[in-house]
Amino acid sequence: MEGSLLVASSTSNNETANTASTDGATRRLSFAKIHEPLDVPNLLALQTDSFDWLVGNERWQARVAKAVEEGDLSVATTSGLADIFEEISPIEDFQGTMSLSFSEPEFADPKYTMAECKDRDATYSAPLYVKAEFMNNNTGEIKQQTVFMGDFPLMTEKGTFVVNGTERVVVSQLVRSPGAYFERTADKTSDKDIFTAKIIPSRGAWFELEIDKRDQVGVRLDRKRKQSVTVLLKALGWTEGQILEEFGQYDSMRATLEKDATETREDALLDIYRKLRPGEPPTVEAAQSLLDNLYFNAKRYDLAKVGRYKINRKLGIDRSLGDKEASVLHVEDIVAMIKFLVALHAGEKTLMGKRDGEDHELRVDVDDIDHFGNRRIRAVGELIENQVRTGLSRMERVVRERMTTQDVEAITPQTLINIRPVVAAIKEFFGTSQLSQFMDQNNPLSGLTHKRRLSALGPGGLSRDRAGMEVRDVHPSHYGRMCPIETPEGPNIGLIGSLASYGRINPFGFIETPYRLVSEGVVSDEVQYLTADDEAEVLIAQANAPLDADKKFSEETVLVRARGGGGEPVLVPAADVQFMDVSPRQMVSVATALIPFLEHDDANRALMGANMQRQAVPLVRSEAPFVGTGMERAAAVDAGDVVIAKKAGVVTEVSAELVVMINDDGTETNYRINKFARSNQGNCYNHRVLVNEGQRLEVGGIIADGPATDQGELALGKNLLVAFMSWEGHNFEDAIILSQRIVAEDVLSSIHIEEHEIDARDTKLGAEEITRDIPNVSEEVLAGLDERGIIHIGAEVEAGDILVGKVTPKGETELTPEERLLRAIFGEKSREVRDTSLKVPHGESGTVIGVRVFDRDNDDELPPGVNQLVRVYVAAKRKITDGDKLAGRHGNKGVISKILPIEDMPFLADGTPVDIVLNPLGVPGRMNVGQVLETHLGWVAKTGWKIEGEPEWVKNLPNLPRETGQTTVATPVFDGAREEEITGLLDSTNVTRDGDRLIDSSGKTRLFDGRSGEPFPDPISVGYMYILKLHHLVDDKIHARSTGPYSMITQQPLGGKAQFGGQRFGEMEVWALEAYGAAYTLQELLTIKSDDIHGRVKVYEAIVKGENIPEPGVPESFKVLIKEMQSLCLNVEVLSTDGTTIEMRDSDDAVFTAAEELGIDLSRAEPSSVEEV
C-alpha cells in the first residue's frame, strides 16, 4: 500500500492525536489508506467565480492577472458586462448619421448592507453606471455622459442573492453546447441509415444537412424546406468543377450534383430564395442579403466562443477564437461540414484536419448528445448576462426611435436612453425565472447543495414531459463531473444533478475534473484538469491502484477506463497509464460524500440518504457524528454558516452578537453573530460563539458555530444507541420505537420560527387602523397587547389569539332616523368598523420573540397604499413526538410509532437502555448494509479502544493510535474502514468497570427486556448510529376541521390544511359505505356535513337547542348539476314519488334568519386570500 497514510480529515498532515488544534476543531481519526494530493476546492466557486466574471470585480481581475502570468490563454480577459456593452455599441440610427456607444461599466456602493435589505424587504444591489458617448457622424461632434443603468443585484459572500428581503439562489443550467453535431438514424421505410448534421449556434438560424435513403445530400436552412446541398455551394460562389474536385470521390455528392438543375450562382441564389420565402418575388440582391443575414452577419448570428471552439475541434478547422469573425459561419466551415458528413456516410473512419496549427487526424463518428463534451453549464454570470442582453436590445429599439424623433442639437446620451427595459429584464429574471429559486435553508448542507445544483430544465433547456430516458441516465462522462447518485426522486429524476466534489467549470462552460499526471508508470502529485472530450483520449487509473513507496504502480498491469469512455474497464501495462484519479470521492457530490460506508450501500438507498440529509432540521444542540467521512469540516465551512476568521489575529471583544479581532496587520475586523433569526424554511438560524477574549486565531479559525454545526463540523443529527430487533410488532414496516429519554432531555428537539405579518392600508371607505380598541372583544383577549394594539415580546400565544389588533371601516348603510339621532349626540364614535385583526393560525402556538413595525410616518419605504406594516415572529420548541420522521444517512427512514418509557426499553448487560429500536428487516431487502457497519464503528468510537500486540489488520493503519478513549473517526467514501478492521477494533474496545466487553467481535450482544428483566433469546446488534430528524413534522401535517370556508359554486367545504378544509369523502369511500348498507351515515355525509346549505344550518340549530336532527334537504351540487344540464338545453325537472314537480328554491331566507339567531355563519363563501382563512 502506498505509504498507507492516515490523513486527518481537514488537512493533509499526519497529526493523528485526537487533540484540539489551534482553530478549535477536533481531529478525526481517519481510516483512509490513499494519499490525496489535492484538497477539496472551494465548494461555492461555481457561483462566486461566475458572478465575479460578470461584474469584473477585484477578485476576478486578480485571477485573470494570475492566468495571464501563467500563460493560460483560455481565460476571458474582459468582464461579462463589458462584453455586452461592447457588443451593443454602437447603436446607430437608420441613416447612420448618429451613433451611441457604451463603455466602462462600474458599480457605486450598495445603498443598504445585506442585513438591512433582509430587514426592509429590499434587494441587495448596487447602482450600475456606464460611460455613454453620443456622436453626430455628420459634424463629428461628441457628447459624453455617465449614465445610471439601474440597480444591479449583487451576490453575497455565500453565493446567494437577496431579492425583496428573501435569499434566493440562481441554479446553473445544463444545456446543449453550440457546435457541430452528427447523427445516424435508421430509416423506417428501408434498411438504410439516414445521416444528419447540424450546426447549433448560441443564437441565430440552425444549419442542417441530411443524406437520405436515396443518397442525396440535402441542406435545410433555418428549419425550412430541404434543398440540394450543391445549390447552396453554388450560391456561395463555387463552380461545378470546384465541387467535383473537392468531393468527386464521394458517390453521394456526385449523385446530388447530377440531379441539380441550377447552372450559375444567380440561379442558385434565386432557387434558395424561393424555398425560404415562398410567394415573394425573388431578386438576386434580396437572396444574397437573406443568406448573409442568416449565417454571416455578427448581429444576427453568434456561435459564441464555445461554438467556434467546438466546431474547430470537431471539423479540424484552425480559426483563432479571438478573431472578430470567429463568431459567424464561413464557407470553409460549411465545406468541412459537408465533407465530414459524406465521409461518415461513406463509412470512412478518419479525416485529416488541423488542430493548434498542426495536421491532426480526426475521428469520423456520430455524436452522443448526452456526453458531457456536448453539454455545457450556463452558470449565474451567463444567465444574468443573457438577461441584460435582452434588456439592452429592447432599449436599443427605443434609442433608435428617439434618435429620429428628437432634435439633433438637443440630443444627449441621457435623453436617448430609457433604462426601464434593462431594469425590468433583470427584475423579471430574479423574480420569476425557473432558475432563480427560493433558497433551501433547511440546514447548511441543503443550502450548499442548492448552490451546486445543475438543472437541465428552464428556458432554453428541456421540459419534464419531453425528456426521455437517455437524457436522465447516468453517462460515463459524468465521472468526476456530476454525481451519479444525488438526484431527486420523481418526475425530475436525472434532469437535476449535483456537481461532483472536485469538479470545476472551465471558461467555455464545460465541467473539468482533476487527475494526477503519470509518466513511465510513476505517479506525480502534479494535477491536470481534463474536460470530458480530453478524457476520452487518455488512459486513467483508479485512485486506489496500488503504489509502492516510490509512487510506482506495484503491479505489472493496471485497471483503467477504456479510451472513448463507456464500456468495461481494461487492464493495460503500467507504463501506458497517463493519468490517475486524485481521490476516490472524486465521482460523488458533497452530500453523497458525507455518507460513511457508501461503498456498502445500494445506489437507490444512497440517493435517498443524500437527499434526506438535506431535509435534516437543525437541533437545539448539535452533535458531530462519531462516524464521519472527513468531509464534514469542508462542507460546513464552505456553506458559509459558520463564522470564520478572515485574517489571523487576536480576539479582543466577545459578546453574543459581535466578536472583534485585532489582526496581525494592525487592522480590526468585526464579525456579526446571528441570534435566533428565521431561515427561509422557518428553522432557527442561530450562531454560538466558540472563542474567548485574548484567544489567537489563524486564517480560517472557527469563531462561531452556526445551525447544525459542532466545532466547525457539519452536525445534522444525533448519535443514538440503536438496537436492531423487532419489538412487539411496533416497528413493523419501518416504524421506529424511541426512548422517552430523547423527549425528556431534548435530544431531538428543534426550534421553529414563524413570521406573521399584517398591513394597514387605505381603503375606499377610509384608512384601516392598527389599534387596541377592537369592537366586541373582551378585555382578557386583549391582555397581551400593548397600547398600540401589538402583542408584547415574550407573550405565550395559542391558536386564535390576537397578535395585532386592526379595524377596517365597514360600508356605510342608509341610516335610520334613530341612528342619525345617536350619531348627532355621540359623534363619530359609533361609526361601523369590523375586526380584521391578525390572529395565530390554527394548530400553531409559541412564544413571541420579535416584533418589527414599519410606519410611513417614520419614513420607512412601504408599498403604495400601505400606511403601516407589522411583523410578529413566534418561536416554538418542537419536541420529538410520534408521527415525526427520522432517518439515518443510508436511506433508512421511518416514522416514530411509539415512545416508550426508559424503563421499558431493552437494556445492555451494564444496565444502559438503548435509545432507539429499528426493525432488522429494513436492512437485507434494501441492501444498505452501510448502516450496520456504521453502527459497529460507532460503538467502537464511543467506547474507545486499546490494541494489544500487532494483529494483521493493523498493518494497513500505521498511524492509528494504539490506545484512545471516546473519539470521532472518519471513514472516507470508497476508502474507509474495512470489515476486518472493524472486527479487530470490536475485539479491542475498552472494557467496563467490571472488566467486561459488552459487545463481541460480531457486533452483537445480549439484550434484556426492560419490562420483565429477562434476556432476549438471541444476540442482537447494538451500536451508535447517526440519526437525523427530518423536516416532515407531524405538527405541520395534522389537521382537523369543525366548520370552515365553503366553495363558492358547489357550497362544499374546501380541501387542504392551508384552506382549513375538510377531508374528502370520495367515490370509493361512498362505495364502502354502500357495501355496508350504512344509508343514514351516507346520507349525512352527502348532505348536512357537506353542501345542503339549509340542512347544515338547521342541524346546528337542532344541536344547540338539543332537539332531534331534522331531515336533510337537497345538496347544492345537485342543483348545480341540474343548472348545468339546463344550460345544455335539456329540460330537467325534479319529481317527487307521487309525480308532482318539486320547486328548486334558491337558498332560503330561513337559513339566514336561523344563522342570525345562532350568531354563526355557515354559508361562508371561499375566502379570497389565505389571510382571511
Swiss-Prot record:
Q: Which GO terms describe its biological process?
A: DNA-templated transcription
Q: Where is this region: Disordered?
A: 1-23
Q: Does the keyword Ribonucleoprotein apply?
A: no
Q: Where does the source fall among the domains of life?
A: Bacteria
Sorted alphabetically, which Gene3D superfamilies does this protein's record hold?
Answer: 2.40.50.100, 2.40.50.150, 3.90.1100.10, DNA-directed RNA polymerase, beta subunit, external 1 domain, DNA-directed RNA polymerase, subunit 2, domain 6, RNA polymerase alpha subunit dimerisation domain, RNA polymerase Rpb2, domain 2
Q: Per its UniProt record, what InterPro entries does this chain match? A: DNA-dir_RNA_pol_bsu_ext_1_sf (IPR042107), DNA-dir_RNA_pol_bsu_external_1 (IPR019462), DNA-dir_RNA_pol_su2 (IPR015712), DNA-dir_RNAP_su2_dom (IPR007120), DNA-dir_RNAP_su2_hyb_sf (IPR037033), RNA_pol_bsu_bac (IPR010243), RNA_pol_bsu_CS (IPR007121), RNA_pol_bsu_protrusion (IPR007644)
Pfam families noted in UniProt:
RNA_pol_Rpb2_1, RNA_pol_Rpb2_2, RNA_pol_Rpb2_3, RNA_pol_Rpb2_45, RNA_pol_Rpb2_6, RNA_pol_Rpb2_7
Which Gene Ontology MF annotations are present? DNA binding; DNA-directed RNA polymerase activity; ribonucleoside binding
Quickly give the catalysed reaction.
RNA(n) + a ribonucleoside 5'-triphosphate = RNA(n+1) + diphosphate
UniProt cross-references to CDD domains, sorted A to Z: RNA_pol_B_RPB2
One cellular component GO annotation, for this chain's record? DNA-directed RNA polymerase complex
Low complexity bias: start-end ranges: 8-22
Keyword terms of this UniProt record: DNA-directed RNA polymerase, Nucleotidyltransferase, Transcription, Transferase
Q: What is its EC number?
A: 2.7.7.6
Q: How does it assemble?
A: The RNAP catalytic core consists of 2 alpha, 1 beta, 1 beta' and 1 omega subunit. When a sigma factor is associated with the core the holoenzyme is formed, which can initiate transcription.
HAMAP family per the UniProt record, alphabetical = RNApol_bact_RpoB (MF_01321)
| UniProt family annotation | Belongs to the RNA polymerase beta chain family.
Entries under NCBIfam families matching the protein: PRK00405.1 (NF001616), rpoB (TIGR02013)
- Record function comment: DNA-dependent RNA polymerase catalyzes the transcription of DNA into RNA using the four ribonucleoside triphosphates as substrates.
UniProt name for this protein: DNA-directed RNA polymerase subunit beta
- Organism in which the protein naturally occurs: Paenarthrobacter aurescens (strain TC1)
Source lineage: Bacteria, Bacillati, Actinomycetota, Actinomycetes, Micrococcales
